[in-house]
Amino acid sequence: WNDIHRGKRDLVVKLHTGEGKTLIGLLMLQSKLNEGEGPCVYICPNKFLADQVYYEAKKFGIKVSLITENNTFPNDFIDGNAILLTYVQKIFNGKTIFGLDNQYQKVNTIVMDDAHACLDAIKQAYTVRISRRRNESMYSDIVGLFEDVLKEQGEGTFVDIQENEDYESIMLIPYWALSLI
């Protein structure tokens, strides 16, 4: 990484379990901090793994900080003196402290540990499931609202969902469809 990929963006580090991905990610971020290129964030798929990474960083003398109990950023992270260690739900939610639009916390480099698990958690956080049996009126309203977009994805599946209450099909409403309503 240091010799060949240091200046590149959007890198994927792929190693087998137990081969040191966590330490490599922490060292990559530490090198960015050493060069004055902070703030840096290390994202884990869950709080349990974030706790493990915290202790591993401490074991190797890598300075990490955590979001405070009152949900604010520690100064050593903001100043680029420590890696912020957090988990995906802290970042991807409707009330993220990282901010939106012009009110946001600048971050220079991010390492996402176990990206597949993080992406699954993000997807789940932004997924709304409506049970036809428990919320028939709401279910019908949503299906009607997005009928054209859902038919474009697959008319047969749409008909199965519309006519057969026990069918186990799932159709996703694309994000861009929200701008059509």
PLM regions and their residue ranges:
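Hydrophobic helix-cap positions at the C-terminus of alpha-helices
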Residues: D3-I4, K32
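Conserved coupling segment at the C-terminus of the helicase ATP-binding
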Residues: R6, D10-V12, H16, K106-T109, ...
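Pre-Walker A (Motif I) flank of P-loop NTPase domains
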Residues: R6-V13, G38-P39, N81-I83
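Conserved Walker A/P-loop ATP-binding site and its immediately adjacent core
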Residues: E19-E69, Q89-N93
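Alpha-helical scaffold elements adjacent to nucleotide-binding pockets in ATP/GTP-utilizing enzyme cores
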Residues: M28, L49-F60, L84-Y87, I110, ...
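Conserved, well-folded catalytic cores of nucleic-acid-processing
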Residues: E35, F60, G94, C118, ...
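Conserved motor-coupling elements within RecA-like helicase/translocase cores
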Residues: N70-L84
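Conserved RecA-like ASCE ATPase "motif II neighborhood" in helicase/translocase motors
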Residues: G80-D114, L119-A125
